[in-house]
Protein backbone atom coordinates (compact mmCIF):
# COMPACT_ATOMS: atom_id res chain seq x y z
CA UNK A 1 0.00 0.00 0.00
CA UNK A 2 1.28 3.45 -0.94
CA UNK A 3 0.93 5.96 1.84
CA UNK A 4 -0.34 9.36 0.82
CA UNK A 5 1.75 12.26 1.94
CA UNK A 6 -0.23 14.57 4.18
CA UNK A 7 0.76 18.11 3.35
CA UNK A 8 0.62 20.73 6.07
CA UNK A 9 -2.14 23.30 5.66
CA UNK A 10 -1.01 26.81 4.82
CA UNK A 11 -2.85 28.95 7.35
CA UNK A 12 -3.98 32.22 5.74
CA UNK A 13 -5.74 33.76 8.74
CA UNK A 14 -5.57 33.44 12.51
CA UNK A 15 -8.49 34.46 14.71
CA UNK A 16 -8.33 34.76 18.49
CA UNK A 17 -11.09 33.81 20.91
CA UNK A 18 -11.14 34.13 24.71
CA UNK A 19 -12.94 31.23 26.36
CA UNK A 20 -13.78 30.91 30.04
CA UNK A 21 -13.54 27.29 31.22
CA UNK A 22 -15.55 27.09 34.44
CA UNK A 23 -16.96 24.61 36.93
CA UNK A 24 -16.47 23.52 40.51
CA UNK A 25 -13.09 22.34 41.80
CA UNK A 26 -12.11 18.75 40.86
CA UNK A 27 -14.58 18.38 37.96
CA UNK A 28 -11.63 17.94 35.57
CA UNK A 29 -11.34 21.27 33.75
CA UNK A 30 -7.54 21.31 33.69
CA UNK A 31 -7.41 17.62 32.75
CA UNK A 32 -9.72 18.22 29.78
CA UNK A 33 -7.60 21.14 28.61
CA UNK A 34 -4.43 19.07 28.99
CA UNK A 35 -5.86 16.16 27.02
CA UNK A 36 -7.02 18.52 24.26
CA UNK A 37 -3.81 20.52 23.91
CA UNK A 38 -1.63 17.38 24.01
CA UNK A 39 -3.91 15.52 21.57
CA UNK A 40 -4.60 12.88 24.18
CA UNK A 41 -1.00 12.19 25.16
CA UNK A 42 -0.95 14.01 28.48
CA UNK A 43 -3.34 13.38 31.37
CA UNK A 44 -2.92 15.21 34.68
CA UNK A 45 -2.54 12.37 37.17
CA UNK A 46 -1.47 14.55 40.08
CA UNK A 47 -4.25 16.93 41.09
CA UNK A 48 -3.25 20.51 41.81
CA UNK A 49 -5.98 23.06 42.39
CA UNK A 50 -5.95 25.99 39.98
CA UNK A 51 -5.50 29.33 41.76
CA UNK A 52 -7.34 32.20 40.13
CA UNK A 53 -7.09 31.89 36.34
CA UNK A 54 -4.48 30.12 34.22
CA UNK A 55 -4.33 30.89 30.50
CA UNK A 56 -3.66 28.14 27.97
CA UNK A 57 -3.44 28.93 24.24
CA UNK A 58 -4.69 26.20 21.90
CA UNK A 59 -4.74 26.65 18.10
CA UNK A 60 -7.55 24.94 16.19
CA UNK A 61 -7.60 24.65 12.40
CA UNK A 62 -11.17 24.90 11.15
CA UNK A 63 -11.95 21.89 8.89
CA UNK A 64 -12.07 22.57 5.14
CA UNK A 65 -10.58 26.04 5.58
CA UNK A 66 -7.17 27.66 5.89
CA UNK A 67 -8.23 29.49 9.04
CA UNK A 68 -6.87 28.84 12.52
CA UNK A 69 -8.68 29.90 15.68
CA UNK A 70 -6.43 30.42 18.69
CA UNK A 71 -8.45 29.59 21.79
CA UNK A 72 -7.25 31.54 24.82
CA UNK A 73 -8.58 29.12 27.43
CA UNK A 74 -9.09 30.81 30.80
CA UNK A 75 -8.84 27.82 33.13
CA UNK A 76 -10.80 29.24 36.04
CA UNK A 77 -10.47 28.11 39.67
CA UNK A 78 -13.63 26.45 40.94
CA UNK A 79 -13.10 27.21 44.60
CA UNK A 80 -15.34 29.82 46.26
CA UNK A 81 -12.12 31.40 47.55
CA UNK A 82 -11.47 32.86 44.10
CA UNK A 83 -14.96 33.67 42.78
CA UNK A 84 -14.77 37.27 43.92
CA UNK A 85 -11.50 37.80 42.03
CA UNK A 86 -11.90 35.94 38.77
CA UNK A 87 -14.49 38.10 37.01
CA UNK A 88 -11.75 40.68 36.43
CA UNK A 89 -10.17 38.23 33.98
CA UNK A 90 -13.37 37.87 31.96
CA UNK A 91 -13.26 41.21 30.17
CA UNK A 92 -14.22 40.56 26.56
CA UNK A 93 -15.30 36.95 27.17
CA UNK A 94 -18.38 35.86 25.22
CA UNK A 95 -17.57 32.16 24.92
CA UNK A 96 -17.50 29.58 27.71
CA UNK A 97 -17.17 25.89 28.52
CA UNK A 98 -19.18 24.81 31.59
CA UNK A 99 -17.89 21.56 33.09
CA UNK A 100 -19.49 19.28 35.68
CA UNK A 101 -18.72 15.85 37.11
CA UNK A 102 -21.47 13.27 36.46
CA UNK A 103 -20.85 11.80 39.93
CA UNK A 104 -21.68 15.13 41.61
CA UNK A 105 -25.13 16.73 41.43
CA UNK A 106 -23.69 19.75 43.24
CA UNK A 107 -21.22 20.36 40.42
CA UNK A 108 -24.06 20.27 37.86
CA UNK A 109 -26.14 22.75 39.85
CA UNK A 110 -23.12 25.03 40.17
CA UNK A 111 -22.84 25.22 36.36
CA UNK A 112 -26.13 27.10 36.40
CA UNK A 113 -24.65 29.67 38.79
CA UNK A 114 -21.47 29.93 36.69
CA UNK A 115 -23.61 30.51 33.60
CA UNK A 116 -25.45 33.40 35.25
CA UNK A 117 -22.18 34.85 36.60
CA UNK A 118 -20.64 34.81 33.13
CA UNK A 119 -23.69 36.44 31.58
CA UNK A 120 -23.63 39.22 34.16
CA UNK A 121 -19.90 39.81 33.55
CA UNK A 122 -20.31 40.58 29.83
CA UNK A 123 -19.17 44.14 29.02
CA UNK A 124 -21.78 44.29 26.23
CA UNK A 125 -25.07 42.81 27.46
CA UNK A 126 -26.47 42.91 23.93
CA UNK A 127 -23.97 40.29 22.76
CA UNK A 128 -24.98 36.71 23.59
CA UNK A 129 -22.87 34.39 25.69
CA UNK A 130 -22.11 31.35 23.55
CA UNK A 131 -21.35 28.35 25.72
CA UNK A 132 -21.29 24.57 25.83
CA UNK A 133 -22.15 22.27 28.73
CA UNK A 134 -19.78 19.36 29.35
CA UNK A 135 -20.53 16.25 31.41
CA UNK A 136 -17.13 14.90 32.43
CA UNK A 137 -16.05 11.57 33.98
CA UNK A 138 -18.67 9.59 32.06
CA UNK A 139 -16.31 6.61 32.22
CA UNK A 140 -17.22 6.14 35.89
CA UNK A 141 -19.43 3.13 36.74
CA UNK A 142 -23.16 3.89 36.25
CA UNK A 143 -23.88 3.40 39.96
CA UNK A 144 -21.70 6.44 40.71
CA UNK A 145 -23.59 8.74 38.34
CA UNK A 146 -25.70 11.29 40.19
CA UNK A 147 -26.58 13.38 37.14
CA UNK A 148 -28.70 11.87 34.37
CA UNK A 149 -27.37 12.88 30.97
CA UNK A 150 -30.87 13.50 29.62
CA UNK A 151 -31.50 15.97 32.45
CA UNK A 152 -28.28 17.82 31.65
CA UNK A 153 -29.15 17.77 27.94
CA UNK A 154 -32.58 19.28 28.68
CA UNK A 155 -31.07 22.15 30.68
CA UNK A 156 -28.52 22.79 27.94
CA UNK A 157 -31.21 22.83 25.25
CA UNK A 158 -33.38 25.20 27.29
CA UNK A 159 -30.46 27.63 27.53
CA UNK A 160 -29.37 27.19 23.88
CA UNK A 161 -26.14 25.41 24.79
CA UNK A 162 -24.51 22.52 22.96
CA UNK A 163 -24.05 19.49 25.21
CA UNK A 164 -21.21 16.97 25.31
CA UNK A 165 -20.63 13.90 27.50
CA UNK A 166 -16.91 13.21 27.71
CA UNK A 167 -14.12 11.65 29.73
CA UNK A 168 -10.72 13.24 30.27
CA UNK A 169 -9.38 9.90 31.48
CA UNK A 170 -7.21 8.28 28.77
CA UNK A 171 -7.89 7.58 25.98
CA UNK A 172 -10.12 10.62 26.45
CA UNK A 173 -13.64 10.00 25.12
CA UNK A 174 -14.57 13.01 22.93
CA UNK A 175 -12.39 15.27 25.09
CA UNK A 176 -11.69 17.54 22.13
CA UNK A 177 -15.32 17.95 21.04
CA UNK A 178 -16.26 20.94 23.27
CA UNK A 179 -13.19 22.91 22.18
CA UNK A 180 -13.71 22.19 18.48
CA UNK A 181 -17.35 23.24 18.84
CA UNK A 182 -16.40 26.58 20.41
CA UNK A 183 -13.75 27.25 17.75
CA UNK A 184 -16.18 26.44 14.93
CA UNK A 185 -18.93 28.61 16.43
CA UNK A 186 -16.50 31.51 16.80
CA UNK A 187 -15.34 31.11 13.19
CA UNK A 188 -18.90 31.01 11.83
CA UNK A 189 -19.85 34.06 13.87
CA UNK A 190 -16.81 35.88 12.47
CA UNK A 191 -17.75 34.91 8.92
CA UNK A 192 -21.31 36.18 9.48
CA UNK A 193 -19.97 39.53 10.69
CA UNK A 194 -17.66 39.84 7.67
CA UNK A 195 -20.52 39.04 5.30
CA UNK A 196 -22.78 41.59 7.01
CA UNK A 197 -20.06 44.23 6.78
CA UNK A 198 -19.50 43.52 3.08
CA UNK A 199 -23.24 43.77 2.41
CA UNK A 200 -23.38 47.09 4.24
CA UNK A 201 -20.48 48.43 2.16
CA UNK A 202 -22.15 47.38 -1.10
CA UNK A 203 -25.38 49.10 -0.07
CA UNK A 204 -23.68 52.29 1.08
From Swiss-Prot:
It is found in: Cell projection, Cilium, Flagellum; Cytoplasm, Cytoskeleton, Flagellum basal body. The keyword Nucleotide-binding applies. Changing residue 194 to R: Does not affect interaction with IFT25. Keywords: Cell projection, Cilium, Cytoplasm, Cytoskeleton, Flagellum, GTP-binding, Nucleotide-binding. GO terms for molecular function: GTP binding; GTPase activity. One of its GO terms (cellular component) is cytoskeleton. Changing residue 79 to Q: Shows higher GTPase activity. GTP binds at residues 23-30, 75-79, 136-139. Its main location: other. Coiled coil: none annotated. It comes from the Eukaryota. The keyword rRNA-binding does not apply. Gene3D superfamilies: P-loop containing nucleotide triphosphate hydrolases. InterPro entries: P-loop_NTPase, Small_GTP-bd, Small_GTPase. Small GTPase-like component of the intraflagellar transport (IFT) complex B. Forms a subcomplex within the IFT complex B with IFT25. Has very low GTPase activity either because it lacks the conserved catalytic Gln in position 79 or because it requires some GTPase-activating protein (GAP) for GTP turnover. Belongs to the small GTPase superfamily. Rab family. Component of the IFT complex B, the core composed of IFT25, IFT27, IFT46, IFT52, IFT74, IFT81 and IFT88 as well as associated subunits IFT20, IFT57, IFT80 and IFT172. Interacts with IFT25; the interaction is direct. NCBIfam families: small_GTP. This is Intraflagellar transport protein 27. It comes from Chlamydomonas reinhardtii.
Amino acid sequence: MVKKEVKPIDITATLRCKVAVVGEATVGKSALISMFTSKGSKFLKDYAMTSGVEVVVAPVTIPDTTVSVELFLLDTAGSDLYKEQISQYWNGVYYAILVFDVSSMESFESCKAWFELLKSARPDRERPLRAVLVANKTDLPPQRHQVRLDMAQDWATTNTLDFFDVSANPPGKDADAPFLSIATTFYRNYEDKVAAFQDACRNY
